[in-house]
């Protein structure tokens, strides 16, 4: 059984240690509040007459960041994620990544915006901004080098937690300087991405579980040609891959676009340092997005396209309908959350408005929700329903032109010339080869792993 495997036991012990470290710092944070208020009641924590002294507030900031950061997987406290996710059953991995690590985001917001009364220095938000940037960039860079599919998805959880922190950090900075509408925008963007990540990451982990169920392996190098054998799983996995790569019109695009806009609005800040730092964070987020797209081009292409590279892949069959239903529901949710932000933004606005003092739902949504804008449409705006219609229209037009131009022509099929040799799966481009150019570009970051 699974619990008898040394790797599973090691992962379980590592996760146990890390989660207890996180819990210890969370308890320490609550004890700091309790010591000053004389109560463990959340209502007492937020009482205006019992605010913490400045020194204790900063200590509570760091203890909360370490405690909830260990739960969320913020770099450098992320080390348990690549161990725990591959070892856990896929449906548990979906639950851990989709729900469990998101409770840490709730905890951070609850402490900083609620218990602290939303009163904090600018460097608190900047600390979250730096932590988010580092987590997003390093998470996706290590995901590119990972060929265990569930390990790859685990590193992408680190990346997306970083993206969420970018929105929250920007919101905290704006809130410090009294820019309440922009603070609400950053916080709303972070929460929107929290929901979206729960949807597409759960979908991808269920997809990885379906592949493991049919092929008995998690290694991408042993996949290939699975789209013909597992068309439903392939279609659902593709939707998840497009969503996590933040391509329109899926949900990941909307929330990541809002995070970008909150960072670009830094020109309204009064200090030159922050005016420069937030766009730099946006540039790092853009690099993260490009690397995420490359990573899932690798993950999907090497898994589902070309020829099978192992006997397991050659004999793979589609998973039962009971496994497809969950993936289908989450795939539909990824599309709905992308096409219908008017269903999500008002709900999130009810959360962010009391915390930031600004209700922005009517400003973010224009034309009855068909257009999403960062507080004002004069700055920028986007419409995912219109983008979806344009994409469908462009595809239909391309097919029509191809049919008209090819009318009367007979299709001819030939084998690709292989220099006189029969092509075999060993000649295919591998996941390792796909990631090699990026590894060489960032070779100073990639270092050998030493297990003690």
Where are these regions (language model features)?
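Extended, non-catalytic scaffold segments that flank or surround catalytic motifs
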Residues: 269, 412, 428-429, 450-452
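Short, non-transmembrane cytosolic segments of multipass membrane proteins
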Residues: 438-452
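Hydrophobic transmembrane alpha-helices and their helix-loop junctions in integral membrane proteins
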Residues: 1-319
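Alpha-helical transmembrane segments and their membrane-interface junctions
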Residues: 243-258, 333-351, 448
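Cytoplasmic/organellar membrane-interface segments at the starts of transmembrane helices
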Residues: 4, 221-237, 288-440
């Amino acid at each position: 059984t699974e619990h008898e495997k040394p790797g599973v036991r090691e992962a379980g012990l590592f996760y146990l240690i890390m989660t207890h470290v996180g819990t210890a710092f969370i308890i320490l944070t609550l004890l700091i509040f309790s010591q000053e208020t004389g109560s463990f009641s959340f209502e007492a924590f937020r009482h205006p007459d019992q605010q913490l002294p400045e020194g204790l507030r900063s200590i509570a900031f760091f203890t909360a960041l370490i405690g909830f950061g260990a739960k969320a997987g913020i770099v450098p406290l992320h080390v348990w994620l690549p161990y725990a996710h591959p070892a856990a059953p896929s449906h548990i991995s979906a639950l851990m990544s989709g729900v469990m690590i998101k409770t840490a985001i709730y905890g951070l917001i609850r402490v900083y915006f609620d218990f602290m009364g939303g009163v904090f220095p600018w460097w608190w938000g900047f600390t979250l901004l730096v932590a988010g940037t580092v987590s997003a960039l390093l998470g996706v860079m290590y995901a590119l080098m990972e060929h265990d599919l569930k390990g790859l998805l685990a590193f992408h959880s680190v990346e997306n937690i970083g993206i969420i922190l970018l929105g929250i950090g920007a919101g905290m900075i704006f809130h410090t300087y009294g820019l309440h509408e922009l603070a609400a925008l950053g916080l709303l963007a972070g929460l929107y991405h929290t929901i979206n990540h729960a949807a597409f990451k759960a979908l991808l982990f269920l997809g990885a579980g379906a592949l493991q169920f049919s092929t008995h392996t998690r290694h991408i190098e042993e996949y290939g040609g699975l789209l013909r054998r597992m068309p439903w799983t392939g279609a659902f996995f593709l939707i998840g891959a497009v969503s996590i790569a933040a391509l329109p019109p899926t949900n990941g695009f909307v929330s990541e676009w809002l995070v970008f806009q909150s960072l670009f609005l830094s020109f309204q800040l009064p200090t030159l340092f922050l005016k420069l730092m937030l766009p730099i964070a946006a540039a790092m987020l853009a690099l993260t997005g490009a690397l995420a797209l490359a990573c899932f081009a690798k993950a999907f292409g090497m898994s589902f396209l070309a020829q099978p590279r192992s006997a397991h892949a050659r004999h793979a069959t589609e998973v039962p309908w009971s496994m497809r239903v969950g993936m289908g529901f989450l795939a539909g949710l990824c599309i709905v959350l992308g096409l219908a932000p008017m269903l999500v933004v008002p709900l999130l606005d009810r959360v962010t408005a009391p915390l930031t003092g600004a209700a922005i739902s009517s400003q973010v949504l224009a034309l009855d929700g068909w257009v999403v804008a960062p507080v004002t449409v004069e700055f920028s705006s986007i419409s995912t329903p219109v983008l979806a219609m344009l994409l469908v229209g462009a595809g239909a037009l391309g097919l029509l032109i191809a049919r008209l131009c090819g009318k009367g022509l007979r299709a001819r099929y030939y084998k690709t010339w292989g220099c006189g040799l029969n092509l075999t799966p060993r000649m295919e481009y591998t996941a390792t080869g796909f990631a090699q150019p990026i590894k060489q570009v960032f070779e100073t970051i990639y270092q050998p792993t030493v297990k003690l």
